[in-house]
């Protein structure tokens, strides 16, 4: 399988919602709760929201409540999107860059797969961790708070 071409990437096929946004939406005590809910609402009115198996799994740890999670995702008509095989090569490439820059992890982190999924599926990422994505996926369209740490 050839590495995916991102020549036509513009993030216009929808929004892949990162784990931290869903966590903030669930946690009414989070400093980011209102922002997360506002972003989910605004994004869902403009384009389809997406979640993949990695994000879904992260949201079920430590206490799985599949019914509650599915109900929340359904509120925003969130599509459960499969990881395309082509994102494997892109995630590996990004992870290689991470290792060359001194990253200590020996196996790719979930965000590498999430970023690669967004890139090959032409999705924008909604997250609080802009730097974590644009560092390794510089062409990726990212919606994040415009503050330190966002």
List each model region and its residues.
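Active-site-proximal, substrate-binding regions of enzyme catalytic domains
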Residues: 64-86
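Short, well-structured N-terminal submotif of metal-dependent ribonuclease cores
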Residues: 1-51, 61-71, 143, 150
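Short, structured coil segments at secondary-structure junctions
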Residues: 76, 136-138
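Conserved glycosyltransferase catalytic-site signature
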Residues: 19, 53, 110-112, 130
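A general structural signal for well-ordered alpha-helical segments in protein cores
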Residues: 52, 56, 66-69, 88-92, ...
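Active-site neighborhoods of divalent-metal-dependent phosphate/nucleic-acid chemistry enzymes
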Residues: 2-10, 79-124, 128
